[in-house]
């Protein structure tokens, strides 16, 4: 689960920039969203895209994150984390029930846990900048709830809305989609390049993504050489403490 923190004062400008790039995307590729997995694999609407254009799209979103200083919060749930942090997870599950997340499967439970922990991590971060800061609203890709559904979470004694929407209708979500893709792609590039030289496209991708490493606020991400990618080594205990 990946979330992005955008200052309320920047929302309108960010929307204008995203809509401009989305209109270009529609004109060039007849696509409504930036699907970076498809872009890099030359699939679906992006079947005919060349490497330069693919890198340009990655650069666009990296520059958006830098320009608006968008902070990125990540949360992954694993069986080991659940075993080691039973009390924490029990508390998170209680919050999930208060939010109305009636999860049937374990996967749905973990999705709601990741969402709530992400929100709590985001709250902790914005309050660390200034005691006056707060989470104004949360927008989440449809999954736990259908498009246009909403619920609330209590933060600091206040009810904060969680609105569920599609990334096609709510373009801000595409920034979070990109941030999630960037993290996954970095790990994949690392795995593929063990003991061998990274391919040119992957190396250029890593060089672009290296610039947004500091924006991931709750992982320790260090790149001493773009050719070797990003090393993520902060533990779950460090993230939640």
Regions found by a protein language model. Give the residues of each.
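Phosphate-ester processing/binding pockets and catalytic centers
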Residues: 1-241
């Amino acid at each position: 689960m990946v979330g992005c923190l955008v200052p309320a004062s920047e929302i309108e400008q960010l929307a204008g920039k995203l809509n401009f790039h989305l209109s270009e995307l529609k004109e060039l590729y007849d696509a409504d969203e930036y699907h970076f997995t498809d872009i890099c694999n030359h699939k679906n609407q992006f079947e005919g895209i060349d490497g330069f254009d693919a890198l340009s799209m990655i650069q666009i979103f990296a520059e958006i994150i830098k320009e608006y200083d968008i902070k990125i919060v990540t949360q992954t749930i694993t069986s080991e984390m659940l075993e080691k942090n039973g009390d924490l997870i029990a508390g998170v599950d209680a919050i999930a029930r208060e939010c109305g997340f009636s999860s049937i499967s374990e996967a749905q439970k973990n999705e709601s846990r990741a969402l709530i922990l992400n929100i709590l991590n985001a709250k902790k971060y914005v309050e660390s900048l200034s005691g006056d800061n707060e989470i104004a609203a949360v927008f989440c890709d449809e999954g736990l709830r259908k498009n246009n559904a909403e619920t609330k979470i209590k933060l600091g004694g206040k009810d904060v809305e969680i609105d569920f929407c599609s990334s096609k209708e709510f373009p801000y979500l595409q920034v979070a989609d990109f941030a999630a893709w960037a993290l996954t792609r970095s790990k994949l590039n690392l795995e593929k390049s063990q003991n061998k030289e990274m391919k040119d496209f992957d190396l250029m991708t890593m060089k672009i993504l290296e610039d947004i490493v500091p924006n991931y606020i709750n992982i320790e991400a260090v790149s001493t050489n773009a050719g070797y990618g990003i090393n993520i080594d902060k533990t779950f205990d460090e993230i939640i403490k």
